[in-house]
Each structure stands twice: as C-alpha cells, then as structure tokens.
A protein has these predicted regions:
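Acidic (Asp/Glu-rich) sequence patches and key acidic residues
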Residues: 1-209
Length: 209
C-alpha cells in the first residue's frame, strides 16, 4: 500500500537506447541520486508476469491482478538502478536491448521471471521525490518515448501536476495504514486475553476526513 508510479512500454526508436541512458545518468548526477549501470545477459525460459488493473475497494482506487505464462528470452538487460531517496523504492530504468522495451527480471530459487510493467513506490519519501521522479519520466517520455512509453501515476500528479491531490492521497493512505495498525493491535491484544479499549470511531473518522 502506498502512492506508486507505474510505467511500461518502450522507446520509440531502439537505436536511441544509449542516448536515453545517457540522459538518465545526467538527471541522476544533476539531482544527486546514486545509481548503478547494469548490463546482463537474458537468455532461456522465463516465467512471464502480466498485470491487469481492476477496480479497487475504495472510490477511484484500483487493484492489480496477475497472470503468468512462459516465454523464451535471447537478449541483454541494460539500464540503471537509481536510488532517488533512502525511503523510496529503487527506480529501475531497465530495458530489453533488442527493442528498448522496459523490462524487469527477477530470480527466485531456480525460477527466472520477466515482467514488462515497472513501478516505484514513493509513499514514504518526501513528496518532492515523487515530483522529481515524474519530471524524469516526463523527460524520458517527451524525448524518447512519446509514442510508446506509458506512465500511470496513482496520485494523478504525472498527468495534472496537482500537488494538492498528491498530498491528499498520501495523507489518506497514511491514515488508512494507521487505522489498520490500530485495529491489528486491538485484535492481537484481544487474542492474548488483555482488556483493551476499542478504537474511537469518531477519531478515526476525523483522521480520514
């Protein structure tokens, strides 16, 4: 749970992958973001994850369902692993070298997996980090992926630059997590026989609103 930016697709021209990576390195250096350049062989069978958005439990929120299959890879996985802030997830800007498509590779045990949907959660970092990541993705899209690169920001900031909406969503999620923590603690204490006061419904309502 937390405000997340999702992105997928490819550069419009695979021949410009090196130029796009140079631009991303320039952005990292200008903003003081640590990063690592990565280049790996990606070959053989991989379990492929496909994600689909569905309506979520709250108004204007979405959930994601996952489908799996198998695919054969014969390419290289190139790009950057970027650290915008210690309290932000790593921003992985990794591409299939052949078609400059955004690609995420993972290995769990003996299983290699691939996904073509990327994301970065910014909930716990300062909101300025969310804004900065959106600026970098806007530049990547404008200069290299106008036709094929898709970005979806759960807060809507990428699309609208509405800071108030971003801050409200962060606050709503933080309040929901606080409520969940309170309720979980009540259940845990009740399970071991302690007497506890139930959560104040009026206080919870005020926090959410």
């Amino acid at each position: 749970m937390g405000v997340t930016i999702h992105f997928h697709g490819a550069l419009d021209d695979p021949a410009r992958l090196d130029a796009a990576l140079a631009m991303l390195r320039e952005e990292c250096e200008r903003r003081g973001w640590p990063y690592r350049s990565l280049d790996f062989e990606a070959c053989g069978p991989h379990e492929m994850y496909t994600f689909h958005q569905v309506p979520g439990p709250l108004l204007d929120w979405t959930d994601v369902i996952t489908e799996t299959g198998m695919t054969e890879l014969d390419t290289r996985w190139r790009g950057l692993s970027i650290e915008p802030h210690p309290d932000c997830e790593s921003l992985l800007m990794m591409f299939d070298e052949h078609d400059a498509r955004l690609m995420l590779l993972t290995t769990v045990g003996d299983t290699n997996s691939v996904s073509y949907c990327m994301s970065v959660k910014t909930q716990f970092a300062p909101p300025e980090i969310h804004v900065a990541i959106c600026e970098v993705l806007h530049r990547l899209q404008d200069e290299f992926g106008h036709e094929k690169l898709i970005v979806y920001d759960e807060s809507g900031y990428f699309q609208t630059q509405d800071m108030a909406a971003l801050l409200k969503m962060r606050d709503d999620i933080e309040a929901a997590m606080d409520d969940l923590e309170t309720i979980t603690r009540v259940v845990q204490l009740g399970a071991i026989g302690d007497e506890v006061e139930p959560p104040d419904e009026d206080a919870l309502y005020e926090r959410r609103n």
